[in-house]
A protein has these predicted regions:
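Bacterial N-terminal signal peptides
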Residues: 12-23
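Phosphate/dinucleotide-binding and metal-coordinating scaffold of catalytic cores
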Residues: 24-197
């Protein structure tokens, strides 16, 4: 009975997705415009991201959390208790200089051992960018043992003509410790919006 219910729900969701995608007006598709960050998100570019920061700052970052029980007005966002801390980053051996690093996520992806991360390139230098981007998002995929759901979802959206962030994969190290494979996701900010709209 439970299995039939799950199957029925899955079929209905697939039908709804199909109806949504088929109703999307043509001409709204994302136009592929090459930019300097294209290579950063190429699927065949398995990034190696090495982060160096004070162990004190790393522990502070890892143990920050958002209180999901806090009182909020309807529609009000959670108070952002995550703060950017100074770090040095290299991507595929290229030093990016001082950046800001913070934890990201709410419940599942806010692990203390392997947190999802945001890298802010304009933390130490106003207007600082890397390949035209002001930040990167590294998702830990803790809730996805396959590690590919986010990548495949965004690829499906783009194939359907919907704007979606570019992404690929990265091996992430902090202070020499290997944290694992993360999804490197284009942050939805001004550079993304200018690229797709």
């Amino acid at each position: 009975m439970k299995r039939e219910f799950i199957s029925l729900v899955a079929v209905r969701l697939a039908c709804l997705l199909g109806m949504f995608l088929s109703a999307w007006p043509s001409g709204q598709a994302e136009v592929a415009q090459p930019d300097s960050a294209d290579g950063l998100f190429a699927l065949d570019n398995f990034l190696e991201v090495k982060i160096q920061m004070s162990p004190l700052y790393w522990d502070r970052l890892r143990y920050q959390y958002r209180d999901i029980t806090q009182e909020r007005k309807p529609g009000e966002a959670f108070k952002d208790n995550y703060t950017y801390l100074p770090a040095l980053v290299s991507i595929n051996g290229e030093s990016i200089g001082p950046v800001g690093l913070r934890k990201k996520g709410l419940i599942g992806s806010s692990s203390t051992q392997r947190p999802s991360l945001k890298i802010k390139f304009n933390f130490a230098k106003k207007g600082g960018r890397y390949l035209g981007l002001d930040r990167l998002t590294l998702n830990n995929n803790i809730q996805d043992p396959s590690l590919v759901k986010q990548y495949l979802s965004y690829k499906l959206f783009r194939k359907a003509g919907l704007p979606a962030p570019r992404c690929n994969f990265a091996r992430v190290f902090v202070n020499g410790q290997y944290l694992g494979v993360y999804t490197n996701v284009e942050s939805v900010r001004k550079p993304f919006l200018k690229r797709v709209f």
